Every structure is written in C-alpha cells, then in structure tokens.
C-alpha cells in the first residue's frame, strides 16, 4: 500500500478540548513513537500534558495513548524526541509554562522514561545576550549529529507577559548523551528582514553542516534557512528558501537514513502549502491548508517532487522515515470555530514513489 492514513489523536475521544503539536520518530524495525499535546483549552497557555502512542508494525496498529509528561496546573508542551541509536535510547525535551525546560530519556524503546531533569539553567545562560520571558524547544523531533552531539533548535521571546513576540532562535546541545546541555549561539533575532523567527527544524547535511529550516513572519511568506559547521556556532546569515512557502506554521524536515537504499540522503519536508487566491487570516498568517510533502535530492537547494497529503485544513506536522516508508504526523480538520485549532492528529504513511507519481 503506497498511501494510507490513520487517526491517532482526537480531541473528543481523548478527552481534551484540543490535541495539538505532533512529534514523530522512527526507531527502526517497524517501530514508531507518536507524541502530541493534550490541552484543557485551545490556548497555548492552557493546562496540558504530553501524550504518546507506539506502533510496532510500521504504523498499522497503535497502543493506546498514555501520558509521558505532566505537571498539575501547568502548561506541558513542545515535545522534542530524539532517536539515539548509538546510545540505544530516546531522548525527550519539553517545556513547562514557557519558562522551564526539562529533559528525560527512555532506554526501553519508549516503554518508560526516567524522572525528568530541569535544564532551564542552559537557557539562563542566554540572559546576558537575550532577556527572555518565554522559552520553548522545537517542537517536533530533533537529531543526533555524526559526532554524537544531541542538537535541539529552540526559540525564545522577550515580549511583555505571555507574548510570543518579539522572538529569536538558537540551538542547545549536549556532547555527553544528555547529561549536560550547553547554549549555542543565537542564530537570528527579530528584525525587519526576518521578523519573529520561532519554531525551527534541523537536519545534518552530507558534508556535516547543519541546516536550520525556520518559521518566520516575513511578508514574503517563505521559509528561511541558516547553516552551521557544528550546529551551535558560526551560523551563516539567514536567507529565504524561495521554493518553500511559509504560511507561518511549524513544519517537518527529515533526512532519509542510510538503510533506505536509493533514497538514502533524500530530504523530506512537510508543511501547509496553501491554495491559490488565499488571503491572510486575522493577523499575518495565511490559512493552514493543503499539507504537502516535498523531496530534495541536492541538500535542500531544490525541491523537484511534491504531492499533497491533506488538501483541506492541516497545520503543524512532523515527519520521519524508515522501513521503506515516509511517515507524516499532522494536525487535521477544525476542532472549533477557529480553523487554526485542529480536530485531531493524523498519521499518513507513503513511499517516495507515491510522492513522485504526483496526483
């Protein structure tokens, strides 16, 4: 079967006002972990907890949803899972109340997670350079570099109260398997060229450089990119990726692994690509419609193949690859009178050949 979908999280079924913020990792051997955030209200600031479901048959069947991170009365959000094959573990980062960041890990394939460690001190080291009031990792999966470094894109805001703007982006990293975390350089701060950069995804390129693919609020409505030799320092000036439309929304990005045969090294990107004639909704953002997958065979310089996964309402997405398939976990439908709030989270499974066939 070249294309299939399954609904993994549902607002009503799972007992939440809103289920959002997908994160997805492929462990190999047909095993997948899908994360989401269950919220008591639709607001980013509502009480919430991180949910997870597990598949052992390439996404055909799934375990019941269970809570993997919670804190009574608090926001618990922005799951960032990392598959670390060398250390045989899954790392997980998340934030609480947009002011603390936690790290935990699983050494049994996601069956259990260690007690979380507060790593907010890593963000405190930014204060001489950036006086943040809001912090968040990811969201979505992140990566282990070939050097063994764990790398997580983060965003911070220095607004008044709970404001998520103005914002900047950076990375944090660990060179000791998650035991300690260090702050990288600030990649880009809010300015007229690239207003309010925020939710960012990372990929390691074939030459060892790290590329960040950046959400932003530019009126050009295009994704932005920046490059670093180590994922933490010497970032290039940000530039626009003209081939990648930006409705102002979180996106997914993954590099297909060495076990994927002729498709090894292909970059896979997912986000809402929009429809002709759409105009901005309230604020600057464009409607989140027509979730589309794109393939690049030249390290993200061009994206010659694309296909729509979900033609109607679809928001945040994350993407994983393994076992000959691409997996995309994404917000779909409308769960309230505001289309930005989805009805649930769906998984699509498909092949590279399916993308190349187009519609």
Where are these regions (language model features)?
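Asp-box/BNR beta-propeller blade signature and adjacent active/binding-site loops
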Residues: 1-359
